[in-house]
């Protein structure tokens, strides 16, 4: 389901405690950076962030967690249409360096486009681990690759949010998808795929068996081309926005366990993460 309304006056995003940036301070050696998806807000990953924050090291300290609201999100779809992909990258870098000032190790993670940004960061920065939920490296709609040609004449198409199997779950997204922003997402995905061999950190990829937005090829690309250890966890009862779906408790538990391992300086992953 998708929560939509009068996006032009910002009413649907007025609750900053739900849709705005999130910072959960921690004193362990690990900081975690989690990133939301395309046209959505931090609301889609807040429960995931709080679950990860519950991880503890041997001294009982919790990790610090940061969840930024990416440029062009949580306002109007027209504002998203004006953002170059580098604006998203730079916003993520800013939060990465903030965590590096506070913690010895940084774990990056994200949902959908946020997963692509997490991978892009892991290829360029020193990270201790990567957590991905249906990362956007290949889209189900193959026509999306031509968005750069269509955007000058077609500003937007109906929204793509709300791919959740759980009936009472709500994902707050724009009711329109700006094609100019899709074109920028395509650039990000293409560049990220080329950079995958530069990633050496252990990576957990949560992949929904049914995803109407991101192709399952995305997880395969990470597993085949990343230079680090990769574990793919198949989610059998969730659609694209798995952080709000039936399998959320499973991915939260595995993510929390992974962060606890990283806090102890362990870079390996459990043999069976499920």
Regions found by a protein language model. Give the residues of each.
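Short, surface-exposed "cap/lid" segments of acyl-processing enzymes
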Residues: 11-76, 205
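Active-site nucleophile elbow and catalytic-triad environment of alpha/beta-hydrolase enzymes
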Residues: 17-19, 178-196
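Catalytic histidine neighborhood in serine/cysteine hydrolases
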Residues: 62-66, 220, 224-241
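Gly/Ala-rich beta-loop-alpha elbow adjacent to hydrolase catalytic centers
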Residues: 110-114, 118
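Active-site nucleophile loop of the alpha/beta-hydrolase fold
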Residues: 131-142
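Short beta-strand/loop motif that positions the catalytic acidic residue
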Residues: 199, 205-207, 211
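Conserved alpha/beta-hydrolase "acid-adjacent" motif
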Residues: 212-218
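Catalytic active-site module of serine/aspartate enzymes centered on a nucleophile-bearing elbow/loop
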Residues: 236-274
């Amino acid at each position: 389901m998708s929560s939509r309304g009068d996006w032009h006056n910002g009413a649907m995003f007025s609750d900053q405690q739900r849709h705005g940036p999130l910072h959960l301070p921690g004193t362990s050696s690990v900081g975690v950076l989690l990133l939301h998806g395309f046209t959505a807000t931090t609301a889609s990953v807040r429960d995931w962030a709080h679950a990860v924050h519950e991880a503890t090291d041997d001294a009982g300290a919790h990790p610090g967690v940061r969840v930024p609201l990416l440029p062009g999100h949580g306002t109007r779809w027209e504002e998203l249409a004006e953002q170059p992909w580098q604006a998203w990258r730079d916003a993520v870098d800013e939060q990465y360096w903030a965590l590096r000032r506070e913690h010895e190790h940084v774990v990056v993670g994200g949902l959908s486009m946020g997963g692509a940004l997490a991978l892009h960061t892991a290829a360029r920065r020193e990270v201790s681990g990567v957590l991905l939920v249906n990362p956007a490296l290949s889209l189900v709609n193959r026509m999306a690759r031509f968005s750069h040609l269509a955007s000058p004449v077609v500003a937007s198409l109906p929204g793509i949010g709300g791919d959740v199997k759980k009936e009472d779950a709500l994902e707050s997204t724009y009711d329109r998808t700006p094609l100019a922003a899709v074109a920028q997402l395509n650039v990000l995905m293409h560049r990220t795929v080329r950079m995958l061999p530069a990633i050496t950190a252990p990576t957990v990829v949560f992949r929904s068996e049914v995803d109407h937005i991101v192709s399952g090829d995305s997880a395969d690309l990470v597993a085949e081309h990343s230079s680090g250890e990769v574990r793919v966890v198949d989610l059998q009862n969730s659609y694209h926005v798995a952080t709000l779906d039936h399998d959320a408790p499973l991915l939260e538990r595995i993510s929390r366990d992974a962060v606890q391992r990283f806090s102890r300086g362990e870079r390996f992953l459990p043999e069976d993460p499920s």
